[in-house]
């Protein structure tokens, strides 16, 4: 709970001053939290992005009820899981937009974000039983990462009440991937 609070405060600060100006030291000063206390959780500013992603995944996992997916298609399960992730991240949307914008010339930041999202996509593919020992299984995580990335950018600018633009984009991309997989599976 302490870490979650620090992540929230960190993301609020990122929203206020941007990624470039953000640092663990600045968080310590502004929030009057001893630096050595913050360093228990975050070794550097990049750590907060890593811990954030893991926190989001943990929150999703705690809300999952596998039995709700028993009669759902793989596509529907992936859709629900990704929408759960967007819902979990909603309060951090503007901070995430600033981080994404700053990442364009920050290879280390891109690497951390990519690694975490790839791990999440692997987790989602496992939950949806999408791996089936097919020769193309190794591509699934990359395709899902691509789908997530495009949908993420749509989500960042989606101000509709029910995230209808995000849902439409995600459904369109997952349907295209499903059609592609069916064609490839027929080889």
Where do the PLM segments sit?
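Amphipathic alpha-helical packing segments from all-alpha helical-bundle domains
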Residues: 107-130, 138-149
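Amphipathic alpha-helical segments used for helix-helix packing
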Residues: 88-108, 121-125
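Short, basic, alpha-helical segments at the C-terminal edge of helix-turn-helix-like DNA-binding modules
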Residues: 53-61, 68, 107
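Hydrophobic alpha-helical connector segments
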Residues: 51, 65-98
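Hydrophobic/aromatic-rich alpha-helical bundle segments in the mid-to-C-terminal region
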Residues: 130-176, 180-187
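Helix-turn-helix
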Residues: 5, 13-51
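N-terminal positioning helix adjacent to the helix-turn-helix/winged-helix DNA-binding module
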Residues: 1-9
């Amino acid at each position: 709970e302490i870490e979650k609070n620090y992540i929230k405060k960190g993301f609020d600060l990122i929203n206020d001053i941007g990624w470039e100006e953000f640092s663990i030291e600045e968080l310590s000063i502004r929030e009057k939290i001893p630096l050595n206390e913050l360093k228990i959780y975050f070794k550097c500013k990049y750590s907060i992005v890593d811990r954030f992603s893991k926190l989001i995944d943990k929150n999703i996992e705690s809300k999952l009820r596998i039995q709700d997916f028993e009669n759902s298609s793989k596509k529907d399960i992936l859709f629900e899981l990704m929408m759960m992730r967007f819902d979990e991240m909603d309060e951090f949307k503007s901070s995430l937009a600033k981080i994404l914008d700053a990442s364009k010339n920050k290879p280390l930041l891109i690497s951390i974000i990519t690694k975490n999202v790839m791990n999440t996509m692997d987790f989602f593919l496992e939950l949806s039983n999408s791996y089936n020992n097919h020769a193309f299984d190794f591509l699934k995580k990359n395709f899902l990462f691509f789908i997530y990335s495009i949908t993420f950018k749509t989500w960042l600018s989606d101000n509709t009440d029910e995230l209808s633009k995000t849902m439409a984009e995600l459904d369109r991309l997952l349907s295209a991937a499903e059609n592609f997989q069916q064609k490839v599976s027929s080889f």
